[in-house]
Amino acid sequence: MLVVLLTAALLVLSSAQGVDEEVVYEDSSQQLELEQQSQGHGQHHPKPPPGGLPPRPPASDENGDGDDNDDGDDDGSGDDVNRPERPPQHGGNHHHPHHPPPAAGPQRPPQPGSPQGPPPPGGPQQRPPQGPPPQGGPQRPPQPGSPQGPPPPGGPQQRPPQGPPPQGGPQRPPQPGSPQGPPPPGGPQQRAPQGPPPQGGPQRPPQPGSPQGPPPPGGPQQRPPQGPPPQGGPQRPPQPGSPQGPPPPGGPQQRPPQGPPPQGGPQRPPQPGNPQGPPQQGGQQQSSFLWSFSA
């Protein structure tokens, strides 16, 4: 690349120098044409007799500006070469145009040459573009390749999405499963409610049972009465007493009323119950009652 740029710079400089030289050639050629035209007009008649003597060209050179000779010997030599043509063709003015064309001809080649010179720099510029295009070309394959390259990563990305879908699929089963999972806890909750109901059930029995709890202290008083009836022979009361056995849960309240009546008038049942055997507990109470009455 550096070499190409250097060559391009040299070509540009050379083309610039060529343009300058062409400008100088154009100036000198124009001056020569003017001089030749002036000489042609002033020496048309003298030229034919001498037959194109060489001294006349020197005279023309002397009359001409020395700068023209200084500007370029090539121009002077060209004048010498073209000057023999002047005498035979009294229309040397036309030859001088022909002579400038040679001088202009070099200019024209340099001009196309200068374009050629710049084109090389332009060519290098095109070459760098060509260089990048190769790079761009690689980029294009890489671009399709890079899509291919990324697609593998992109494919993994799609695969991860596929991975998540399995995960999402598990999630879906878990979602129904999670409801199922919660239902088990919910089932335990229901079971727990079922557990509390047993507990609540116990509470309900305890609620009626709590009367049973109090009745037992009052019930022992009743039980001694029950005890006496079996001993007293009234097996019939035990038959209704068996209902009374079940009623304890349902009818302990009746027993408490029965308990208070014994308490209200316990002495009468205890009196028959005293001789019967459970007077131990009931007897103590009756003794307490007797003491109270005696007091």
From Swiss-Prot:
**Do the record's keywords include Transmembrane?**
no
One Gene Ontology term, aspect cellular component: extracellular region
Q: For this UniProt record, give its keywords in alphabetical order, as a comma-separated list.
A: Repeat, Secreted, Signal
Main subcellular location of this protein, as a coarse class: secreted
Q: Give the compositionally biased regions (Low complexity).
A: 26-41
**Per the record, where are the segments of Pro residues compositional bias?**
48-58, 100-187, 194-278
- Kindly indicate where the leader peptide sits in this chain: 1-16
Region (Disordered) residue ranges read 16-295
Residue ranges annotated as compositionally biased, kind Acidic residues, are 62-78
Localisation: Secreted
Concerning InterPro entries, the annotation shows: Pro-rich (IPR026086)
Q: How is it modified after translation?
A: Contains glycosaminoglycans of chondroitin-sulfate and heparan types.
Q: Which domain of life is it from?
A: Eukaryota
Pfam families found in the cross-reference section: Pro-rich
Q: Does the keyword Signal apply?
A: yes
This chain belongs to the protein called Proline-rich proteoglycan 2
Could you tell me which species this protein originates from? Rattus norvegicus
Could you read off the lineage of the organism from its UniProt record? Eukaryota, Metazoa, Chordata, Craniata, Vertebrata
